């Protein structure tokens, strides 16, 4: 008999229909129900008495539009929906996020449970329409954790996986580039270039082979708590809600997933992870996280320009001396070139646009000669952790733990975080299986073993050894001072010093008044190497359902005038997707009206991080919405 996994079912009929299917076919009546009989989507829809969603809008290179609903009205209406009872699905382990960390944890739990002859049900909730659709990285992957998790992975590697052949390092000025030594931490012998989106899809398929249940288009939007304050699970957001927060004809309440342990693997600055960190004061003994914004494109280039396996990084232009960042260009697969720029979000100048800095960076001959004659296929942007050792929060709390970039394990010196994220998932999984062996797991688990054991792995050792590199760029010497200190650290000190440098204290606070700077006149795109933001965002395949609540909450209505006058529209500059803009409005006291084009959001989280007033709040939109990355 043929079977359809729950993950495939969710993809076939849409997330909102799975609740009804599970309810009517028979939800978790027993632990053996890991697969459902194979049927056509239409048959399954008859079972659930639902209809497929038809309300998507695809963003192209077109004029932006936005709805304007009063935040108070929307909040009041959504609050009323919270009184409606949710369907509850009881599982053993709930993982929020089907990225490398979450999937590694899921696979490891299944592996270790099988060895111990236990049945542990693992459910992974993913807000994207498919695993990998929201995954963005360079990516050059160090296979340390992958070798541990799946020792034979090279026999069936991810698509376009390419062994690194050689490294390059360049210092750029506007029209020239100069070779500089490759630091030891950035030498990539034994590593692999690949698309993180493709890698994540591949890893998700491996997880399903182990019996992991992956539910794509399930956007976890709320953490659920017991009466004693411990985490009992999460709830997904509601379907069929209009822009005013009122139920539509196809309304369906979100689903609750209860578990003795919930792992948060949302990636950098996840919305639920942010709330967990605040509620349990997990940053009480560490510094605030600092972030970078990575903006990238994937190109296909002519044979004569292509050097398969080459990994290149750049310093210098277009970054100013007070702005941390650098470029990269990786060549992999079938003539694919991934080119990008990471800009530290602690930059002070509100006129800086990371997305436009990236576009003009490609005009440097170092990049232009490779991209010439090629075709830009995809565009992506995502915030990444740069705080390192100093910014790691407490990882555990009653009923759950933070893993991967939800905690922040990126090694800035290596420009890598996938291997450390995966290792954190592996260590958390081992702690969970051990806890299930000691306990019936009928109550929330406290995974203290996970945190203690992770501190004894290469994850913490790596981050400790390079802890001073990123904050060294904060001195009055700026990037030049940071590069000099980093060279001494890399070749001489190697982290063996009695001091630990500090970060600035938050990226939002680093933003200075526009009065201290001159506006930046970025060159117009040539539509050959450089492109405008609407064209770029169209290459992210971003989709959002029409007539749903705006997932970007602006809590600053009384402060918008002062914010604009002080920072001159910084929101429009830091957003890489054209979500925020100030349009002329004679009726306004300052001649402008703040507009949120939420349908263009690529889920990078920059607004929630960089807004100087910390009044913009990013929340999960309807499940399955957002970008549809395939090669990023």
From Swiss-Prot:
Disulfide bonds: none annotated. It comes from the Eukaryota. The keyword Electron transport applies. FAD binds at residues 93-107. Residues 592-621 form the 4Fe-4S ferredoxin-type domain. One of its GO terms (cellular component) is mitochondrial inner membrane. InterPro entries: 4Fe4S_Fe-S-bd, ETF-QO, ETF-QO/FixC_UQ-bd, ETF-QO/FixX_C, FAD-dep_OxRdtase, FAD/NAD-bd_sf. Coiled coil: none annotated. Keywords: 4Fe-4S, Electron transport, FAD, Flavoprotein, Iron, Iron-sulfur, Membrane, Metal-binding, Mitochondrion, Mitochondrion inner membrane, Oxidoreductase, Transit peptide, Transport, Ubiquinone. Binds 1 [4Fe-4S] cluster. Its main location: mitochondrion. [4Fe-4S] cluster binds at residues 575, 601, 604, 607. It catalyses: a ubiquinone + reduced [electron-transfer flavoprotein] = a ubiquinol + oxidized [electron-transfer flavoprotein] + H(+). It is found in: Mitochondrion inner membrane. It is an enzyme of class 1 (oxidoreductase). Its cofactor is [4Fe-4S] cluster; FAD. One of its GO terms (molecular function) is metal ion binding. GO terms for biological process: electron transport chain. The keyword Flavoprotein applies. Its EC number is 1.5.5.1. Belongs to the ETF-QO/FixC family. Accepts electrons from ETF and reduces ubiquinone. This is Probable electron transfer flavoprotein-ubiquinone oxidoreductase, mitochondrial. It comes from Schizosaccharomyces pombe (strain 972 / ATCC 24843).
């Amino acid at each position: 008999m043929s079977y359809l996994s729950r993950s495939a079912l969710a993809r076939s009929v849409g997330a909102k229909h799975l609740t009804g299917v599970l309810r009517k076919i028979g939800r978790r009546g027993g632990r053996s129900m890991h697969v459902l009989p194979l049927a056509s989507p239409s048959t399954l829809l008859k079972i659930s008495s639902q209809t497929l969603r038809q309300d998507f809008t695809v963003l192209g290179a077109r004029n932006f539009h936005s709805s304007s609903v009063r935040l108070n009205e929307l909040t009041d209406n959504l609050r009323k929906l919270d009184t409606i009872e949710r369907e509850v699905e009881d599982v053993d382990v709930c993982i929020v996020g089907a990225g490398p960390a979450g999937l590694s944890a899921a696979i490891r739990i299944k592996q270790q449970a099988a060895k111990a002859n236990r049945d542990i049900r693992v459910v992974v909730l993913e807000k994207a329409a498919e695993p990998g659709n929201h995954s963005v990285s360079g990516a050059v992957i160090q296979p340390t954790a992958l070798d541990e998790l799946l020792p034979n992975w090279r026999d069936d590697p991810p698509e376009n996986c390419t062994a690194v052949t050689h490294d390059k390092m360049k210092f750029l000025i506007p029209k020239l580039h100069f070779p500089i030594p490759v630091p030891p931490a950035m030498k990539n012998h034994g590593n692999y270039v690949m698309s993180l989106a493709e890698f994540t899809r591949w890893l998700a398929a491996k997880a399903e082979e182990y019996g992991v249940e992956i539910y794509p288009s399930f956007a976890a939007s709320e953490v659920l708590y017991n009466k004693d304050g411990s985490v009992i699970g999460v709830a997904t957001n509601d379907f069929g809600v209009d822009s005013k927060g009122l139920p539509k004809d196809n309304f369906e309440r979100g689903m609750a997933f209860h578990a003795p342990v919930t792992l948060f693997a949302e990636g950098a600055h996840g919305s639920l992870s942010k709330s967990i960190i605040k509620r349990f004061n997990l940053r009480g003994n560490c510094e605030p996280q600092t972030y970078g914004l990575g903006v990238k494109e994937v190109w296909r280039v002519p044979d004569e320009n292509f050097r398969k396996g080459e990994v290149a990084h750049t310093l210098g232009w277009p970054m100013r001396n007070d702005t941390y960042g650098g470029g990269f260009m990786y060549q992999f697969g079938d003539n694919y070139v991934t080119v990008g720029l990471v800009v530290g979000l602690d930059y002070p100048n509100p006129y800086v646009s990371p997305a436009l800095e990236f576009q003009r960076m490609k005009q440097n001959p170092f990049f232009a000669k490779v991209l010439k004659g090629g075709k830009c296929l995809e565009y992506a942007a995502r915030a990444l952790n740069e705080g390192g050792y100093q910014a790691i929060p407490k990882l555990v709390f009653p009923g759950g733990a933070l893993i991967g970039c939800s905690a922040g394990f990126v090694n800035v010196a290596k420009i890598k975080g996938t291997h450390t994220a995966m290792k954190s998932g592996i260590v958390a999984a081992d702690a969970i299986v051990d806890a299930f062996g000691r306990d019936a797991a009928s109550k929330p688990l406290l995974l203290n073993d996970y945190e203690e054991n992770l501190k004894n792995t290469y994850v913490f050792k790596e981050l400790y050894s390079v802890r001073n590199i990123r904050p060294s760029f904060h001195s009055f010497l700026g990037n030049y001072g940071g590069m000099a200190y980093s060279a001494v650290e890399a070749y001489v000190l190697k982290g063996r010093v009695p001091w630990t440098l500090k970060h600035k204290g938050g990226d939002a606070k680093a933003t200075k008044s526009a009065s201290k700077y001159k506006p930046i006149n970025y060159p117009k795109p040539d539509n050959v190497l450089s492109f405008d933001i609407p064209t770029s965002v169209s290459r992210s395949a971003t989709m959002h359902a029409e007539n749903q609540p705006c997932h970007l909450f602006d809590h600053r209505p009384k402060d918008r005038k002062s914010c604009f006058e002080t920072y001159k529209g910084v929101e429009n500059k830091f957003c890489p997707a054209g979500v925020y803009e100030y349009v002329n409005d004679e009726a306004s006291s300052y001649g402008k009206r703040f507009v949120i084009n939420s349908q263009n959001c690529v889920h990078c989280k920059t607004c929630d991080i960089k807004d100087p007033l910390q009044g913009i709040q990013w929340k999960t939109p309807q499940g399955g919405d957002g970008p549809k990355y395939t090669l990023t």
